[in-house]
Amino acid sequence: MGTTKVTPSLVFAVTVATIGSFQFGYNTGVINAPETILKDFLNYTLEERLEDLPSEGLLTALWSLCVAIFSVGGMIGSFSVGLFVNRFGRRNSMLLVNLLAIIAGCLMGFAKIAESVEMLILGRLLIGIFCGLCTGFVPMYIGEVSPTALRGAFGTLNQLGIVVGILVAQIFGLDFILGSEELWPGLLGLTIIPAILQSAALPFCPESPRFLLINKKEEDQATEILQRLWGTSDVVQEIQEMKDESVRMSQEKQVTVLELFRSPNYVQPLLISIVLQLSQQLSGINAVFYYSTGIFKDAGVQEPIYATIGAGVVNTIFTVVSLFLVERAGRRTLHMIGLGGMAVCSVFMTISLLLKDDYEAMSFVCIVAILIYVAFFEIGPGPIPWFIVAELFSQGPRPAAIAVAGCCNWTSNFLVGMLFPSAAAYLGAYVFIIFAAFLIFFLIFTFFKVPETKGRTFEDIARAFEGQAHSGKGPAGVELNSMQPVKETPGNA
């Protein structure tokens, strides 16, 4: 195999794909900053329509729906990933669904002029479906165009896109930028611009070579794309690996979601994929970000919105750090470090919130604990669950597996968002102890069950799980991790 390198074609393709990740992050964070203004819009619109003041219960229900419908859309979208990628391909799927983002942006952007609550809610639903699809398309495409030795680093760019999107939404949501009563429609409708940019750039990106060879049997085109992306003429080893996988796929029928759960070959990697997605959401990160302004306010911070943006900056910086570490330390190690660090920080957050009224310094401890907590999240649990799912499965079951894992991620995201306020009201500062318990459980699970995928081909990983399924062994971390990755040579460095 020739020496692979980071080519302009590869960087361009991955960067354009991560615009979808940016959209997910932006639309996750954009609803939080103008909360008061949007509630006023709901109140005014309903008052005009009902010719009476709406009840507090109706307003609360509608606001909750505006927030939660995004996650419901995400569940629908993530579960529909396979329907698109198997029929249209990875690149063309990303191109097609941008139409959803444009329609959603128009609905949200013109909701105020039309005085329509329904347009706002429908727009949030459609942008949720779009983002759910993106959380499947982007990691899959990046994983399939990246060289084995760089797959983890490029996979982390998916998470970088998400956190940059959240940060941009937080900054643009400031009242003196777009978070004002006059400009909030522009804040929500801004999602149209990345959709148009990505639609314009995607035709210049190649289709996934794995999709072309394995699904479409277009070997010559796949070879040409691989050579251009990786900057080497010698891609014989990768092409042969894809051809072997293509032969295996031709001997099997299309893998459906139901068959994923039935086949002993897929049960263990699917379990790992689901638990890793849960480890991301049940770590408490979204609870911290959804309610960070309130947490900082409770901790005594004078300008909590700026502290929240500070957390977003830390989020972004440590995602970049993870990008450089993931191919050195490995996925499994970084994930465990992240989970362990977050568990410790959760305990410190609890202690500082309990003692802040008695000791002024505890407000500072709380802020530092949150910032370090966010840093540990981006070291492991943030980026790794997204791209490791694509690594654990071969071409056939990959779309269905990503759909199931993505749906679990969105569902747990939705449940945390719905249940955290009640849990926080009932348990107070002790609520973060629940997250600490989850984090410890996920740390133990990762140690015993999650394999190291660094430097290993998709085929190698799939065969390891198949061998264990046939021998009746579970995927204990020691067993699978005792297998050596592809030996580092100039060809895969």
UniProtKB/Swiss-Prot annotation:
Record organism? Mus musculus
Domain writeup: Transport is mediated via a series of conformation changes, switching between a conformation where the substrate-binding cavity is accessible from the outside, and a another conformation where it is accessible from the cytoplasm.
> Which residues does the annotated region (Important for selectivity against fructose) include?
277-279
CDD domains cross-referenced by the UniProt entry = MFS_GLUT_Class1 (cd17431)
Q: What is this protein called?
A: Solute carrier family 2, facilitated glucose transporter member 3
Q: Per its UniProt record, what InterPro entries does this chain match?
A: Glc_transpt_3, GLUT, MFS_dom, MFS_sugar_transport-like, MFS_trans_sf, Sugar/inositol_transpt, Sugar_transporter_CS
Per the record's keyword annotation, is Transport included, yes or no?
yes
The UniProt record gives the binding positions of D-glucose as: 159, 280-281, 286, 315, 378, 386
In the record, which positions carry Phosphoserine?
A: 471, 482
Molecular function (GO) terms for this protein are:
D-glucose binding; D-glucose transmembrane transporter activity; dehydroascorbic acid transmembrane transporter activity; galactose transmembrane transporter activity
Source domain of life: Eukaryota
Q: Which residues are glycosylated?
A: 43
